A protein has these predicted regions:
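Conserved His + Asp/Glu catalytic blocks
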Residues: 121-131, 137-195
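A short acidic, often aromatic-flanked loop/helix-cap motif at beta-alpha or helix-coil junctions
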Residues: 12-15, 22-25, 81, 121-123, ...
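Signature for HUH/AEP ssDNA processing cores
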Residues: 46-128
Length: 195
């Protein structure tokens, strides 16, 4: 006998429903201990894992972010380009730490974010090229301030209203903070783009 199982996932204002056909034999089957993994996943399984990871990111984004939150793209100039992925992760972690500290100073709620680091290896596989970051974070801070913090320089917040001071801050590269734009699927398009 075949029956249908329905799995509902609620993400803030969005709901996903999975319809899963099941048989009684499949429901009652018990599995023993798993054996040691002997071979790599089949391409079919890798595709399913990739699809589920993208779906989870969409659910995470729709459940935690809404209108008024920010999508920030951060790149590096040639002189600031990190040599390794670990070095880039350290730089972006410091950036997020500065944002969290500023939010705390202003009495805003704690920082929530999704970070995706994109990079490709050169043809010889020895080095990375054009590493950059996509960050979805909760709003509250001014977009100009979020962009200004993409620097190694220490920021004197008492002088930030002076345009000359703002211009003197040397950024790590190009940075752009945009407000999230929702549609009927929330931020699904953005989440699929950054994966």
């Amino acid at each position: 006998m075949v029956f249908i199982r329905e799995k509902k996932t609620d993400c803030a204002n969005y709901r996903e429903v999975d319809i899963i056909p099941r048989t009684e034999a499949a429901e009652q089957a018990t599995r023993g201990k798993r054996g040691r993994k002997r071979k790599s996943n089949a391409p079919k399984q890798k595709d399913l894992n990739d699809k589920n990871a993208k779906r989870y990111l969409v659910q995470l984004g729709n459940g935690n972010f809404s209108i008024g939150d920010l999508h920030t793209s951060c790149t590096y100039s040639e002189e600031n380009l990190p040599g390794t992925v670990e070095e880039a992760e350290k730089i972006v972690t410091n950036y997020l730490r500065r944002i969290a500290y500023r939010r705390n100073k202003l009495g805003l709620e704690p920082l929530k974010y999704i970070l995706v680091t994109e990079y490709k290896y050169t043809k010889d596989g020895q080095s990375i090229k054009r590493i950059h970051h996509h960050i979805i974070m909760n709003g509250g801070l001014d977009r100009d301030d979020v962009e200004m913090m993409w620097t190694k320089d220490r920021i004197n917040w008492k002088k930030t209203s002076d345009p000359e001071y703002r211009a003197s801050i040397k950024q790590l590269g190009w940075v752009n903070a945009d407000r999230l734009q929702m549609n009927e699927n929330g931020i699904e398009g953005l989440c699929k783009y950054i994966v």
